[in-house]
Regions:
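Conserved, single-site charged/polar hotspot
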Residues: 1-170
Length: 170
């Protein structure tokens, strides 16, 4: 038996992300499943606002050479099929969506950007990376009296759940 990594996140979009598409062949067991219940979460949509000078300061903390003159210099270059940002350009720098999420402490990399000259708004859907088990949907399944095995099999079909006895180190 092989132990698999089973990632989780708080709230996603209408579907979880596809592990094979995102991370490669070794994560083919992380398939995209319906998480439409996430839309009912109070944390499904979040607006995060930054003045241009604050945005610049936050990025410069990690990238000293970062320059941006106008909020209009922020452009999403690539998203996955669910809308998670894969690549975004800001000023003189390109970033991965997850990297931008970490730099700005955004709830999710599933976002759109709206700007005027001095203000930037990130309209984010979900909380977390969207890969694996949605805690919100899993919680709703539990409220419907689904057992943990059924919940795990829904998010990770094809994986076998086994009991493992842990030995104490003496």
């Amino acid at each position: 038996h092989e132990v698999k990594q089973i990632p989780f996140y708080a709230v996603g979009t209408e579907r979880s992300r596809d592990g094979k598409e995102l991370l490669g062949e070794n994560f083919a067991y992380l398939i995209s499943v319906d998480t439409i219940q996430d839309k009912k979460s109070p944390f499904y949509v979040n607006g995060c606002y930054f003045e241009l000078k604050e945005f610049r300061r936050l990025i410069k903390k990690e990238y000293a050479g970062f320059e941006i003159k106008d909020a209009g210099e922020i452009k999403i270059k690539e998203t996955d099929r669910l809308g998670y940002v894969l690549e975004i350009q800001a000023g003189n720098q390109d970033f991965q969506g997850e990297e931008m999420r970490e730099l700005l402490k955004l709830p999710s990399s599933c976002f759109i950007v709206q700007t005027d000259k001095e203000m930037i708004r990130f309209l984010c859907r979900g909380v977390g990376h969207g890969l694996g088990l949605s805690q919100w949907t899993a919680g709703k399944m539990a409220e419907e009296n689904k057992q943990y095995q059924e919940i795990l099999n829904y998010f990770f079909p094809g994986l076998e759940l086994i009991e493992v006895e842990m030995q104490k180190n003496e």
